[in-house]
Amino acid sequence: MGGSGNWIRSLISNRKPVNDQQEKLSDKSSKKKWKLWRISSESLASSSFKSRGSYAASSLGSELPSFSADEAFTTAMAALIRAPPRDFLMVKREWASTRIQAAFRAFLARQAFRALKAVVRIQAIFRGRQVRKQAAVTLRCMQALVRVQSRVRAHRRAPSDSLELKDPVKQTEKGWCGSPRSIKEVKTKLQMKQEGAIKRERAMVYALTHQSRTCPSPSGRAITHHGLRKSSPGWNWYDDVGTFSRKSSESSVLSEYETVTVRKNNLSSTRVLARPPLLLPPVSSGMSYDSLHDETSTSSTSQSPVAFSSSVLDGGGYYRKPSYMSLTQSTQAKQRQSGLSCNGDARRSAGSDQCTDLYPPGNVWAKSQRS
């Protein structure tokens, strides 16, 4: 009996430190923080081992009547032990994946913000004044280029159109009528029209030339000559401009020389002046010209022709001819006879008359101006 009493006493004396150890473990578990990255499988095993040891101790102490206060704690630990163990490696991977996704989404957001700012800047640049001005200039240049291209194409098509117009068959095709005619009849009709047009042109030319022969003024001849050129089919205004410029240049060069005819007692003489004379007043037949000019040659019935190697001027009023183109005596006699019938005043003149002279001298215009 003594041995059994000692055993009970030793059990009762060892009861308090066991309870103190359980309280300390409960306090530590309550104060401990839940950290995923510090928990491992070893800590889980140690905690399970401690819980089992405490459960064994509590089971031993449950036999005593004073151990009923710790039943709630023991039931909770039992439930924790029965629960399946959680894989903390998967938890770490999920946490790392969320961190990576957040960083990548932040990077995409920054990139989109930069692109948006660039788009806003580009819009501001395109809506600026300089860009609009440059665009307007470029549009004008493109329009000018299109106009030039259209003109070049029209110029290229012009020769083909002219060839088509010259071809009588194509003309007949364009002006085709529904009347029953053969090709020969159409061609003969076209030929008759062309011949009639040629005859009309010849008649106009003949009338103009006849009028120019009867007209004594050189301005009338210039007008008729211009009309002849203008009525011709190959007339072009650019050619008239070129001839006018050439005539003006030649007249400026040849205006340094001028012919003056002086009459004194039915004796005529021709002078050559270095410069064109001024507008002289009408002089009577008895006045002397010795103070103005020196006579070099006199003739009672003919004038001495002036030799020039310059070209003939048809619009300036001065007609000049080279020495080899002067008329012979027989030609002058014929012209004198025709001049008597053309003009009664030509009997008193010593030179050839202008109305029938093919190569009129340069002093005719001066005579007509003085008369």
From Swiss-Prot:
SUPFAM superfamilies: P-loop containing nucleoside triphosphate hydrolases
Region (Disordered), start-end ranges: 1-32, 285-308, 327-371
TM helices/strands, residue ranges: none
Record family assignment: Belongs to the IQD family.
Matches recorded under CDD domains: IQCD (cd23767)
A GO MF label: calmodulin binding
Stretch list, region Calmodulin-binding: 125-141
One of the protein's GO biological processes: cytokinesis, division site positioning
Gene3D superfamilies with a match to the protein in the record: 1.20.5.190
Entry-linked SMART domains: IQ
Record's keyword annotation contains Disulfide bond: no
UniProt xrefs under InterPro entries: IQ_motif_EF-hand-BS, P-loop_NTPase
Biased amino acid composition, Polar residues: 297-308, 327-341
One Gene Ontology cellular component annotation held by this UniProt entry: nuclear envelope
Main location: nucleus
Name of protein: Protein IQ-DOMAIN 7
